[in-house]
């Protein structure tokens, strides 16, 4: 592996997180020496760390994922505070997914999409093919029962997908990825939350200036005041951050 593709690990609350410097570094890491890595990508933000702290099952799923990375700006700031020499930047999951799809389209990597509403999923497929000529070898919307899971996993295995992205929200997507890997282990899995909705324009993402200032969370709160209860949970994370309890 070249130095460009190597990345240090930084531990927060006992979970090792990959320290990517920027998006090119992330892509070089995932495609080290021209070979796409296999395993599970999980985006880590403050809310997910809190959930992992309170729910042992969720923590076990996250801990089992090979590639945990700093998606939230608060997590990046905590890494920098705990490890002053760390050269780590936020790599937003939505941006990483788009970059991964663009690379997959360029290289002809087979992709399987899971999650979203049927119409959103169809629009996602159409846009991926039109924009980057992505080789989509199968898809499944998010409306399937646990009893239907094994048949889905068999489809994914038969498709030969090398990238499987799952948009079902946490922890559902982590459960699906974990279970699917038992049937189809030789692929890169990525949990992407509401990314398909953003990609197809059904949900508006914060403007770039808000993202660059690390205020995407505030934009979402102002756009969706109902999120206030979720945001209040983050006070506990702030205590961890400012008391060096990470």
Curated annotation (Swiss-Prot):
Source organism of this protein record: Salmonella arizonae (strain ATCC BAA-731 / CDC346-86 / RSK2980)
Keyword Transmembrane: no
Keywords assigned: Glycosyltransferase, Transferase
The keyword Transcription regulation is assigned to this record: no
Enzyme Commission (EC) number: 2.4.1.180
Name by which UniProt lists this protein: UDP-N-acetyl-D-mannosaminuronic acid transferase
Described function: Catalyzes the synthesis of Und-PP-GlcNAc-ManNAcA (Lipid II), the second lipid-linked intermediate involved in enterobacterial common antigen (ECA) synthesis.
Catalyzed reactions per annotation: UDP-N-acetyl-alpha-D-mannosaminouronate + N-acetyl-alpha-D-glucosaminyl-di-trans,octa-cis-undecaprenyl diphosphate = beta-D-ManNAcA-(1->4)-alpha-D-GlcNAc-di-trans,octa-cis-undecaprenyl diphosphate + UDP + H(+)
GO biological process: enterobacterial common antigen biosynthetic process
InterPro entries: UDP-ManNAcA_Trfase_WecG (IPR023085), WecG_TagA_CpsF (IPR004629)
Enzyme class: transferase
The protein's annotated pathway: Bacterial outer membrane biogenesis; enterobacterial common antigen biosynthesis
Family: Belongs to the glycosyltransferase 26 family.
GO molecular function terms noted in the UniProt entry: lipopolysaccharide N-acetylmannosaminouronosyltransferase activity
HAMAP family per record: WecG_RffM
Domain of life: Bacteria
